[in-house]
């Protein structure tokens, strides 16, 4: 790295930022939105570590958390580093909202999506409960126009929502491959056709059931056409992401099985498998252990105490968000499930 670049910020390697971060990419990235006022990386790491320990009522853990971060054993998710221990944003990476089949719920979930994205999280949006185009509308002689116009609403919401100067909001729309609107929905990211039905700012996740896979194996023509379209789109664009709902629910934790809870959708990255419904929106509380440093930490207590760290992150989210309008579903889910990842 150009030594002058760090020095121009008044940073000394090994003192103000770690030696493993002595690259131009590190310095430019962390100084672009992650630091508050005149913070240096060391100050930011201490801020995060102390905040997590405070939320746990375990101040003695702050130095341990700081050591993990400084050593690059524990890698912080973007919202954790940017927002933990501050009065801005929330320390949560992403959320999942499930939309009920009513205009009221569609509108309320749009408000929820806007607020979640604004405060630092990507949002997975479940569309499976919505009726397909042509379905009758209650108390009306009309029929619904399907899921795509509502995707357009969420597309515009994400385009209009930013997360300060850290990153723009992001969202994915989840739909079952068996849904009646699949054929139009699978094309919404293509810049062609009716501009009012294009959703160029959304990601897509397609949900696959065991029932569909059995029909596919049995040679059902419509199932094969749909599966072929998914594969063609993935080859061309890398999307839609795929979630095998049957496999997920077979591996549900005991608490889910005991209470009859099923997973119907996922987040943008398709790695979160938590329960959602109209009144529960999942919370994705993340950080990472650095496998490149595995030989350094494999015989330490980093895994054990990193779990405590994440619990402190989740507690900060709950305490910050429980009095914020639009976060009721997420707080309810966090308090009940206490999911960490």
Task: Label each PLM-derived region with a short phrase.
Residues 1-341:
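Extended catalytic cores of very large enzyme megasubunits
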């Amino acid at each position: 790295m150009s030594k002058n670049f760090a020095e121009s910020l008044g940073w000394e390697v090994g003192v103000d930022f770690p030696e493993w971060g002595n690259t131009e990419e590190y310095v430019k990235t962390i100084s672009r939105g992650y630091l508050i006022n005149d913070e240096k990386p060391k100050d930011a790491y201490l801020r995060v570590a102390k905040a997590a320990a405070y939320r746990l009522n375990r101040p003695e853990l702050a130095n341990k958390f700081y050591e993990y971060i400084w050593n690059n054993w524990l890698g912080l998710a973007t919202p954790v580093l940017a927002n933990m221990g501050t009065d801005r944003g929330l320390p949560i990476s992403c959320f999942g909202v499930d939309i009920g089949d009513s205009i009221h719920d569609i509108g309320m979930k749009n408000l929820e999506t806007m607020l979640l994205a604004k405060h630092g999280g990507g949002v997975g949006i479940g569309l499976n409960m919505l009726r397909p185009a042509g379905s009758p509308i209650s108390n009306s002689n009309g029929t619904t126009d399907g899921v795509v116009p509502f995707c357009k609403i969420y597309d515009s919401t994400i385009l209009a929502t930013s997360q300060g100067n850290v990153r723009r909001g992001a969202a994915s729309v989840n739909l079952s491959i068996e849904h009646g609107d699949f054929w139009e929905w699978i094309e919404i990211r293509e810049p062609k056709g009716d501009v009012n039905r294009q959703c160029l700012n959304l990601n897509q996740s397609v949900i696959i059931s065991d029932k569909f896979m059995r029909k596919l194996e049995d040679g059902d023509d419509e199932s094969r056409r749909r599966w072929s379209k998914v594969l063609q789109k993935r080859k061309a664009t890398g999307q839609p992401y795929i979630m095998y709902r049957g496999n997920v629910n077979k591996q549900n934790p005991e608490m889910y099985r005991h209470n009859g809870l099923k997973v119907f959708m996922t987040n943008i990255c398709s790695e979160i498998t938590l329960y959602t419904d109209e009144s529960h929106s999942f919370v994705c509380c993340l950080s990472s252990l650095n496998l490149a440093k595995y030989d350094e930490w494999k015989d330490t207590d980093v895994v054990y105490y990193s779990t405590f760290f994440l619990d402190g992150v989740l507690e900060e989210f709950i305490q910050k968000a429980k009095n914020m309008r639009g976060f009721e579903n997420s707080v309810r889910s966090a308090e009940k499930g206490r999911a960490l990842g």
